[in-house]
Amino acid sequence: MATLILKQTLIILLIIFSLQTLSSQARILRSYRAVSMGNMDSQVLLHELGFDLSKFKGHNERRFLVSSDRVSPGGPDPQHH
């Protein structure tokens, strides 16, 4: 009797979890060619995923905090192998 109840419970749980995965909401990225090419800008990607860039706090200000003229380091440290 206990094994029958256990089997029924497991079947019900399996049905509940499978129904939950069927109702999951995932976004489909329509611009798959641009992503596969590797030349997609992050802002374009966020827009394609449905995010409103104007609602991000300070997304334009952060761009000006980073200097665009980066200098490469002087080479490997002679103290390390």
Swiss-Prot record:
Keywords: Developmental protein, Differentiation, Glycoprotein, Hydroxylation, Secreted, Signal. One of its GO terms (biological process) is cell-cell signaling involved in cell fate commitment. Coiled coil: none annotated. Residues 1-26 form the signal peptide. GO terms for molecular function: receptor serine/threonine kinase binding. The modification Hydroxyproline is found at residues 73, 76. Glycans are attached at residue 76. It comes from the Eukaryota. GO terms for cellular component: apoplast. Belongs to the CLV3/ESR signal peptide family. This is CLAVATA3/ESR (CLE)-related protein 5. It comes from Arabidopsis thaliana.
